[in-house]
Amino acid sequence: MKNILAIQSHVVFGHAGNSAAEFPMRRLGANVWPLNTVQFSNHTQYGKWTGCVMPPSHLTEIVQGIADIGQLAHCDAVLSGYLGSAEQGEHILGIVRQVKAANPQAKYFCDPVMGHPEKGCIVAPGVAEFHVRYALPASDIIAPNLIELEILSKHSVNNVDDAVQAARELIAQGPEIVLVKHLARAGYSSERFEMLLVTAQEAWHISRPLVDFGSRQPVGVGDVTSGLLLVKLLQGATLQQALEHVTAAVYEIMIATKTMQEYELQVVAAQDRIANPEHYFSATRL
């Protein structure tokens, strides 16, 4: 069984960051070690919340505690997501180095959450710059959405070919695999939700139906997507297999959420279909 140190946000109510991804990842058969960068009452798109950002040293201290009991060598991957500060990011890269020293086979999966002001997702000053300058070259796998892909590649991305090219530009700087979590306006169809999975040799495209939630889109979809992809890849799935399973599993969560008329992702209700999706979407090699 694979062990994943997941360093991202936590909400007490609802699902975002680790609170969204942790259970689905476990449902696929991974051990998740959640380390929270923030603890908030709820996700920020409600417009108000309480809670705190963890001091950067807290992250390092927790991981040192795991090292002190001799367990860090059993960590197969570090996953990072929403950061409460750029300084937290620097500490996370130190943790990645520490984990890789204990287990040279360990991977670093970076979900470079950089904020969506129009969606109410706010990140601290310096976080975007941290991802561009430091996290990108340190990562083995990176999972930007379209906006984040443009920030990381430092140019606009207007179509699928542009996205593949931009992903390969990122690969030249460090990571082996790039997941473009949401192609949005750069995709083939505005009626579909599309993703890309790219390496130096391969590029896979997949699409699924959009699920209409009106003006209140559920939060945490990207967090679940990144976490599930990491689990599948660690378990030995091919790029195609991993992309197809993750796309179907996330769709099952979206359908359950819509059917139950909920705003928060219904990861518990959808748990059996996360492991064994009823829908199937075929990835195409470009």
UniProtKB/Swiss-Prot annotation:
InterPro entries, sorted: PM/HMP-P_kinase-1, PyrdxlKinase, Pyridoxal_kinase_PdxY, Ribokinase-like
Recorded family membership: Belongs to the pyridoxine kinase family. PdxY subfamily.
Residues bound to ATP: 111, 143, 148, 181, 208-211
Cofactor field: Mg(2+)
GO CC, alphabetical: cytosol
Protein name per its UniProtKB record: Pyridoxal kinase PdxY
Stated role: Pyridoxal kinase involved in the salvage pathway of pyridoxal 5'-phosphate (PLP). Catalyzes the phosphorylation of pyridoxal to PLP.
Gene name for this UniProt entry: pdxY
EC class name: transferase
MF terms (GO), sorted A to Z: ATP binding; magnesium ion binding; pyridoxal kinase activity
UniProt pathway: Cofactor metabolism; pyridoxal 5'-phosphate salvage; pyridoxal 5'-phosphate from pyridoxal: step 1/1
